[in-house]
């Protein structure tokens, strides 16, 4: 596959959705999952600050292992008002989250940080996509929770999977909801010289 890399890129995430999005964008990269304790980050802080801090922490933790590469850390959360919804731990929590999201609008925040140890350059961007669910019946909520899809996803749903039927409207970046705002990421990587669309002669 044709790639757009000029320099080595590391993805500090084990998310299969981020892996797929970056591959589709033509980025050649390696994966090194960040080993951090997310519970130490205060969930009471504003959603944008919370997700930016996590993306930066992940990027810096992995970047230390790759002095000559650009490292990308990312994190996605769902917020309803001032309440941050993480990944449901089980069926009951998934049902609770889906009930909260039913027939209302919520925000999906994804932040990414790009850094490298041998450079002073560090970019953090956060993108907010507004998503509205249709009114969900109890049967729909329980059926979807039983599919198992909600359990590794912020907010308890996957817009790119079975959970697409939950979504009535979306305003903003679709890939941001999946897990990585590709348009903004490409622009940031290009501004750092990590990628280029010019043909290499």
Positions of predicted regions on the chain:
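N-terminal beta1-alpha1 ligand-phosphate binding loop
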Residues: 4-27
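Catalytic cores of phosphodiester-bond-cleaving enzymes
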Residues: 38-39, 48
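A local structural micro-motif
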Residues: 29-30, 197
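Anionic-ligand binding patches
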Residues: 3-10, 44-201
């Amino acid at each position: 596959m044709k790639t757009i890399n000029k320099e080595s890129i590391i993805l500090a995430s084990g998310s299969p959705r981020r892996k797929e999005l970056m591959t589709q964008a033509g980025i050649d990269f390696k994966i090194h999952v960040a080993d951090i304790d997310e519970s130490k980050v205060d969930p009471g802080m504003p959603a944008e600050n919370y997700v930016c801090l996590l993306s930066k922490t992940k990027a810096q933790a992995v970047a230390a292992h790759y002095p000559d590469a650009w490292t990308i850390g990312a994190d996605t959360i769902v917020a309803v008002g001032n309440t941050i919804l993480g990944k449901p731990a089980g069926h009951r929590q998934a049902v609770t989250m889906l009930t909260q999201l039913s027939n209302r609008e919520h925000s999906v925040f994804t932040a990414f940080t790009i850094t490298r140890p041998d450079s002073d350059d560090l970019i953090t961007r956060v993108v907010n996509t507004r998503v509205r669910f249709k009114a969900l019946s109890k049967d729909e909520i329980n059926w979807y929770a039983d599919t198992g899809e909600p359990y590794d996803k912020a907010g308890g749903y996957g817009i790119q999977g079975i959970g697409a039927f939950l979504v009535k409207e979306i305003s903003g970046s679709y890939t941001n909801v999946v897990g990585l705002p590709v348009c903004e990421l490409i622009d940031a990587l290009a501004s750092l010289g990590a990628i280029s669309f010019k043909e290499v002669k």
